[in-house]
């Protein structure tokens, strides 16, 4: 995110983007601690699906729809995360990478607000 001239709020949100999904921390707690701008970005970045919502394809479609409504700043962070995760998963779990890369291609395709940006092109080149 820093490489692509992200703001301090974007960098903070990039560091916090999995906190709500992976811990008991809430968006409201992030808002209290880091302010509205960071909390809104983290909210845009947090997957909305839950295991009870259906199979993986159904959940990923829900999360894609959520991402499609996100701000351009959140999409930049999401693209940076996609780049980082793609490198790691391709190297460490080639079998899962086949599924993962298809999901991320579909995700990147809904991130039209940043399609003109270098970070989108970098993510696109990895898929």
What do the predicted segments below correspond to?
Residues 1-127:
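Active-site helical microenvironments for divalent-metal-assisted chemistry
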């Amino acid at each position: 995110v820093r490489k692509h001239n992200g703001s301090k709020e974007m960098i903070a949100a990039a560091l916090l983007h999995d906190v709500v999904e992976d811990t008991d921390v809430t968006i409201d707690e992030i808002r209290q601690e880091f302010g509205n701008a960071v909390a809104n970005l983290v909210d845009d970045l947090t997957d909305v699906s839950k295991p009870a919502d259906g199979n993986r394809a159904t959940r990923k479609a829900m999360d894609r729809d959520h991402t499609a409504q996100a701000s351009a700043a959140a999409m930049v962070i999401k693209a940076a995360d996609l780049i980082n995760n793609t490198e790691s998963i391709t190297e460490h779990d080639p079998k899962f990478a086949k599924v993962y890369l298809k999901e991320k291609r579909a995700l990147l395709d809904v991130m039209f607000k940043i399609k003109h940006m270098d970070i989108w092109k970098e993510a696109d080149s990895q898929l």
